[in-house]
């Protein structure tokens, strides 16, 4: 009996590989913590969530190449490396909030259901904290880009003012030549003022 090989696209295998890695990591996390409500320091939680959130993606998908920017001598802003996020903001993300405590009475569950519930709880915490971390990173990138945009706008405005000043200087250099040419023409014109006419009449009578 011949066995026909079924064609499978590599993206399906890759998706299964990621899911298996996620399940293994969650099982290890559950086995180490024991219960999802055990007390941990904010630094340990931050390290675990960040490493679990980005380890699978970094292993399967290589990082994208950085976009090249047109560097100039006047611009002092450069994105060679992403600036680190403030530790106070990270601690605020992983801070324990009282309003997140479950208020309804506990229900008796089988060990399998309780284990599944613990996995779901840990997965929700990881996804929620990872989302907050991503939002914080995007907000910081927005601030850096807005600062760079303001610096570029200020430089362009200064260059425009400098160009207008140069144009005015060029016009002033051409203007004295025209005025010097017009001065003799104005002197050659006869003066028809009242004082001049009165003086001329007095000279004729004298």
From Swiss-Prot:
Name under which the protein is recorded: Protein Mabiki
Consequence of gene disruption: Embryonic lethality with increased frequency of embryonic head defects and reduced embryonic cell death.
InterPro entries recorded: bZIP_sf (IPR046347)
Region (Disordered): 54-77
Gene: Mabi
SUPFAM superfamilies cross-referenced by the UniProt entry: Leucine zipper domain
Keywords of the record: Apoptosis
GO aspect biological process, one term: regulation of transcription by RNA polymerase II
GO terms for MF: DNA-binding transcription factor activity, RNA polymerase II-specific; RNA polymerase II cis-regulatory region sequence-specific DNA binding
Purpose of the protein: Plays a role in inducing apoptosis and is involved in the repair of head patterning defects in the embryo caused by extra maternal copies of the homeotic gene bicoid.
């Amino acid at each position: 009996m011949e066995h026909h090989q079924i064609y499978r696209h590599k993206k399906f295998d890759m998706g299964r590989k990621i899911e298996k890695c996620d399940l293994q990591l969650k099982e290890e996390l559950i086995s180490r913590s024991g219960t999802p409500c055990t007390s941990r320091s904010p630094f340990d939680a931050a390290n675990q969530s960040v490493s679990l959130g980005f380890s699978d993606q970094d292993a399967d998908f290589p990082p994208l190449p950085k976009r090249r920017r047109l560097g100039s001598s006047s611009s002092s802003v450069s994105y060679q490396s992403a600036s680190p996020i403030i530790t106070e903001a990270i601690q605020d993300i992983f801070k324990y909030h009282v309003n997140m405590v479950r208020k309804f009475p506990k229900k008796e569950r089988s060990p399998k259901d309780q284990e599944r519930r613990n996995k779901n709880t840990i997965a929700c915490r990881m996804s929620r904290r990872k989302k907050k971390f991503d939002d914080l990173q995007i907000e910081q990138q927005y601030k850096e880009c807005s600062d760079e945009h303001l610096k570029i706008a200020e430089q362009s405005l200064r260059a425009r003012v400098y160009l207008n000043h140069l144009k005015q200087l060029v016009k002033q250099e051409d203007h004295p030549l025209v005025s010097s040419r017009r001065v003799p023409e104005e002197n050659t014109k006869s003066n028809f003022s009242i004082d001049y006419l009165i003086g001329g009449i007095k000279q004729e009578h004298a």
